[in-house]
């Protein structure tokens, strides 16, 4: 435990598990007040309970970033909390399919959540940051947004769009003391990867120079750095964390 972020309020979307949870915990352990979101009330309540158990400052709240009404309700729910100094746009979904078989809803749902969702959340948080002349926005993209991947045209388009969003917004708000960066994880060890067969797991490792999957905490550490004063001269960048899987 430390107090590096004791005066900061951090908003992390999609924080009930995996990378989002690791990011939320990393900031909470360093003294930040963390608003961590989940799509269900059960998961949000579990986040709140875990925070209490660990003596963290913060709360879990329900939010569906794909639903404007949910975002509006969330905005109302956080009115009595301090405005977020640090926003981590992590929430996202996949609906994989080959393009020729992809249904309209598979395309639209992924774009609406993974790309339009960060527009909604950033717009919600940006005005207080502008007034304070300080802010950190970190968008969780993906190696797929850089390298592409068969069966993921929707996901790849959304994550590549997120990188363009990051660069353009960085140019808009840099003069107000706000930095905007993206992190592009490769294959990260999660509950889903734990369920992969040994054959599939080994085939993944063949494409990773370091010969292992990444850990969620390794992504959280990069996000934590980008939010720190040590990264105050870094903006509009995409940091790849993929073990050498992609070196573009």
What is each model feature region?
Residues 9, 16-18:
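Conserved glycine-rich cofactor-binding loop
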Residues 30-46:
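Conserved glycine-rich Rossmann-like NAD(P)H-binding loop of the short-chain dehydrogenase/reductase
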Residues 98-99, 103-111, 193, 204:
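Substrate-binding pocket helix/loop in short-chain dehydrogenase/reductase
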Residues 122, 158, 166:
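Active-site helix of classical SDR
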Residues 127, 171-175, 232:
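Alpha-helical segment proximal to the catalytic Tyr-Lys
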Residues 142:
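Residue(s) in the substrate-gating loop at a strand-loop-helix junction
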Residues 174, 179, 234-236, 242:
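Short, small/polar-rich loop/turn modules that mediate ligand/substrate recognition or access, typified
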């Amino acid at each position: 435990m430390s107090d590096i972020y004791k005066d900061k309020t951090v908003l992390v979307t999609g924080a009930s598990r995996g990378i989002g949870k690791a990011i939320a915990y990393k900031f909470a352990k360093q003294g930040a007040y963390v608003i961590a979101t989940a799509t269900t009330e059960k998961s949000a309540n579990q986040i709140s309970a875990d925070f209490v158990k660990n003596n963290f400052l913060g709360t879990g709240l329900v939010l569906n970033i794909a639903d404007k009404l949910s975002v509006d309700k969330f905005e109302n729910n956080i009115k009595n909390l301090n405005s977020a100094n640090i926003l981590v746009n992590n929430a996202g979904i996949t609906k994989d399919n080959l393009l020729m078989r992809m249904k309209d809803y598979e395309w639209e749902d992924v774009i609406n959540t993974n790309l339009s969702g960060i527009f909604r959340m950033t717009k919600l948080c940006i005005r207080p940051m502008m007034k304070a002349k300080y802010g950190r926005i970190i968008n969780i993209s993906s190696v797929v947004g850089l390298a592409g991947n068969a069966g993921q045209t929707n996901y790849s388009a959304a994550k590549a769009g997120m990188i363009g969003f990051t660069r353009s917004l960085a140019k808009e708000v840099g003069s107000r003391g706000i930095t905007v960066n993206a992190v592009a994880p490769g294959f990260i060890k999660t509950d889903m990867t734990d369920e992969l067969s040994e054959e599939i797991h080994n085939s993944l490792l063949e494409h990773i120079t370091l010969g292992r999957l990444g850990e969620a905490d390794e992504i959280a550490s990069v996000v934590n750095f980008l939010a720190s004063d040590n990264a105050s001269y870094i903006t509009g960048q995409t940091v790849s964390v993929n073990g050498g899987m992609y070196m573009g």
